[in-house]
Structure formats: structure tokens, C-alpha cells
């Protein structure tokens, strides 16, 4: 059995399974699930393995890989996509038809089924929202073998109840239950625990004429955060943040980063023409913000914008290199807070991180959504210290009205955080939905809820 089916990008160790199935049809999956249900055999669904919370890692039982569900048909305004299709292939196919698929999770090698299962986001979610917003139809195989073909707006046939949800733009912490919700919003973000998503129809948009891209450098963090507040309503589709430690790491590969830069914002803005007045408006905004305008980087070509995106995506690689060389252990967060608490939360993060792990962290990410990631370089001999701090930060995020999981899902690694977010009765409501759709608890055992 290939180790590929026993692990994902989370690094969660100990994955093992008795059998791996690679079906080609919904009816094959239905038969496998009926057999598993009869034997109470746990089943883990395998996408591309890019998830970072361990949902795909099996601990016994069977694995169903969706790699052969690779149908991809692009039509005006939508695409029909098998669960095993990779995100980059959907993007490429849409581009060939002068269209684009707005969701853009960082890992373009992720599968569409996995993106829907964890309701993935990305940098463009600032303007376009998470994956679920773009799903118009789903095919799902339930644990009892029933095959559902579900359209957007089709209400579920039972009342799941309603749980209080945070006032944030992104949230993937458990099942986001509300009375009258539709099936698509129930399955999107359920992380393979309620059914097997095999195919989707997703909306596409006409490709913009051009896109302005920029990496804007600032002399201080305060200047960058002032710019975030000023630019949020200016219509960018991307508004990303890098702190001073992030820039220090990135200088290893990009020595042309200005020496006086202590923060950076990555922006993209769609243009209606090559002479769009938005170009001049952005020049004025950047100068008014006191940015290092002459030293910042700008582009309107796709190749240069891709270079900027790779610049941002170099950071996780450099973090991993740093952790490996130092013999440390990386821990990270996926918390988000309401927009009004963005600056306050960031200051509180820094205060606690400097007190406990001075100089051993970076903060970067989706500042436009008040959703930044902390990567913490902790001592592998004392993981509890780092875990306790991250849980403290999670409690603070919830206290501020936020979420403990904005885009990565809960998986198996972060099940302990749901009790920080929700009261026992709200977790009980989620478990009731799980029992309704998967009474034998065969799907994704240990994901979302501890085993």
C-alpha cells in the first residue's frame, strides 16, 4: 500500500489502513459504503493530500481515493468538475475560455473535492468569498449508499437547529448549522464526515481585461495597518500582509526587498481597460499611505503577478527550512476575528508571542479578512508550552467574536479547539447531524469530532 494514501500535508504521523479503493463511479462508492456500514468499518476519503489538519490521514479501516473522478467540462458561466480534478487544472481550463474561477487556495495542487469538503479560501476570498459561494450543484454519496444530486437552494429535509456563528467573513469550524440551510452549505466544510462529494458544478466569471498587482512596502507596521483600513473598501481582490520577521526570511531569496521595509501589503485590483482610472487612484492611495512607493513592486502582466504570488508563497517554504535547520517544531494558527478587532488582535498576538517566544515566529496572511496566520518555531522538547499559548490565542480570538478555524478546517489536529469556540449544546447539535447522516459513524472517524 502506497504511503501516499496514509498521509497529508499536516505531517500527522501513524496513518494506516486495511484497504485502499480507487473507484470510478458513484455506484462503486455506494457499494463500498454499504459494505463498510454493515461491518462498522471506518472510511477515510482521500483527495490530493494537501490538507494541513490531518482529515485525510486514516487510522484503520478503508480509504476511498477520488483520483479517478476527473471529469472537467467548461461551459459559459460554469464548469462541471469531478472531485479529483486539481485546482490548477480548473484554473487553466477556465482561462482558455477567457473565464476565471474566483477561489484560489494557495495550494494549486489541491483537489476540487477537497476544496469543497473544507470550504477552502485563498487570497481572492477577500473579494469573492470561500469555495462554497461558487458551488451551484453537488453530487454526494451518503454513508448508506444513497446518491444525491443537489442544486443550490435545495433545503435539507430536517431541521439541523441553529448555532451561534462568529461575525467573520470566513469560518470553517465545524458544521455551520442554521434552520433552513441548503444541502450544499451543509456538505461544504463538513470535511468528508457527512458524505462523499464526487462532482460539482461551479460558477465561473468573465476574465478581467487586466489586473494590477503590487507588493507595497512600508517603514512601519502601523503605516501598513493604516493602509489596510483605508484600502479595504477600494475594491482590491487581494489584500495580504507580511510582517517584519516574514520580510527578514524572504530577504534570503529576495535581497531586493528594501532594507527599511518593516511590513508589506500584497494587492491585486481588476481593471476594466489598460487605461482604467483605478491605476492612477492606486498611485494616489499608495503615496497618501506613506508607503515606500519608489521601492515597491508593481505589474499588470500575468507573468509578473505570478512572480509576486510566488514571492508570497516562498514564505512557508522558508519557514519550514528555518524550522528544520533549528531543530524546532512548527505550529500555526488559522484564527480570524471581526474586522473591527483586526488591529487589536494583531497587537495582542505580538505582545504574547514576544513574551513567550521572542523572535521565533512570523505573522502573515489575509489581513483584509482579519485572518492572519501565525507560524511559531517551538522547542520540540516542550510542545506543551507552545500548545498552551496557541490555545490562549484561540480563546482570545473567540472572545473578540472570532473563529478558531477560518479556512483550513478542523481535521484531526484541531478537534480540541471546537470546545473553545462552541458551548456543549452546540457541539451536541453538530453530533446530532452527524448521527442523522452517518449513524454508524463510518465517515471521517476522528475528523471534526475526536474518536
Where does each model-flagged region fall?
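C-terminal substrate-recognition/cap domain of FAD-linked oxidoreductases
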Residues: 188-190, 196, 201-392, 400
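Short acidic/histidine-rich active-site segments
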Residues: 403-410, 445-448
Amino acid at each position: 500500500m502506497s504511503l501516499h494514501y496514509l498521509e497529508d500535508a499536516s505531517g500527522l504521523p501513524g496513518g494506516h489502513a486495511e484497504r485502499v479503493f480507487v473507484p470510478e463511479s458513484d455506484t462503486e462508492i455506494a457499494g463500498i459504503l454499504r459494505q463498510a456500514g454493515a461491518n462498522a468499518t471506518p472510511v477515510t476519503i482521500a483527495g490530493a493530500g494537501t490538507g494541513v489538519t490531518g482529515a485525510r490521514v486514516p487510522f484503520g479501516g478503508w480509504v476511498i481515493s477520488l483520483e479517478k473522478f476527473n471529469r472537467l467540462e467548461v461551459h459559459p458561466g460554469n464548469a462541471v468538475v469531478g472531485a479529483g480534478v486539481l485546482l490548477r487544472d480548473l484554473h487553466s481550463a477556465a482561462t482558455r475560455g477567457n473565464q476565471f474561477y474566483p477561489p484560489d487556495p494557495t495550494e494549486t495542487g489541491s483537489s476540487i473535492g477537497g476544496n469543497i469538503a473544507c470550504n477552502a479560501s485563498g487570497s481572492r476570498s477577500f473579494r469573492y468569498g470561500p469555495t462554497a459561494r461558487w458551488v451551484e450543484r453537488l453530487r454526494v454519496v451518503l454513508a448508506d449508499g444513497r446518491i444525491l444530486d443537489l442544486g443550490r437552494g435545495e433545503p435539507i429535509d430536517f431541521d439541523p437547529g441553529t448555532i451561534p456563528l462568529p461575525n467573520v467573513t470566513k469560518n470553517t469550524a465545524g458544521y455551520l448549522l442554521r434552520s433552513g440551510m441548503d444541502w450544499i452549505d451543509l456538505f461544504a466544510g463538513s470535511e468528508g464526515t457527512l458524505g462523499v462529494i464526487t462532482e460539482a458544478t461551479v460558477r465561473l466569471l468573465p476574465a478581467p481585461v487586466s489586473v494590477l498587482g503590487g507588493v507595497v512596502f512600508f517603514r512601519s507596521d502601523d503605516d501598513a495597518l493604516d493602509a489596510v483600513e483605508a484600502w479595504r473598501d477600494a475594491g482590491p481582490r487581494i489584500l495580504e500582509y507580511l510582517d517584519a520577521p516574514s520580510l527578514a526570511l524572504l530577504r534570503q531569496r529576495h535581497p531586493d526587498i528594501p532594507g527599511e521595509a518593516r511590513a508589506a501589503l500584497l494587492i491585486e485590483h481588476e481593471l476594466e481597460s489598460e487605461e482604467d482610472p483605478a491605476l492612477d487612484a492606486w498611485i494616489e492611495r499608495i503615496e497618501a499611505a506613506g508607503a515606500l512607493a519608489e521601492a515597491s513592486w508593481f505589474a499588470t502582466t500575468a507573468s509578473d503577478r505570478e512572480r509576486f504570488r510566488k514571492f508570497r508563497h516562498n514564505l512557508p517554504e522558508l519557514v519550514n527550512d528555518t524550522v528544520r535547520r533549528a531543530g524546532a517544531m512548527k505550529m500555526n494558527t488559522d484564527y480570524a476575528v471581526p474586522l473591527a478587532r483586526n488591529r487589536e488582535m494583531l497587537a495582542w498576538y505580538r505582545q504574547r508571542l514576544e513574551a513567550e517566544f521572542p523572535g521565533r515566529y512570523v505573522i502573515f496572511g489575509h489581513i483584509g479578512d482579519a485572518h492572519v496566520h501565525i507560524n511559531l518555531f517551538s522547542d520540540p522538547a516542550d510542545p506543551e508550552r507552545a500548545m498552551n499559548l496557541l490555545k490562549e490565542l484561540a480563546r482570545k480570538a473567540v472572545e473578540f467574536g472570532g473563529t478558531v478555524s477560518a479556512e483550513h478546517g478542523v481535521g484531526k489536529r484541531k478537534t480540541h479547539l471546537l470546545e473553545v469556540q462552541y458551548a456543549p449544546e452546540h457541539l451536541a447539535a453538530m453530533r446530532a447531524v452527524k448521527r442523522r447522516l452517518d449513524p454508524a459513524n463510518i465517515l471521517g472517524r476522528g475528523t471534526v469530532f475526536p474518536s
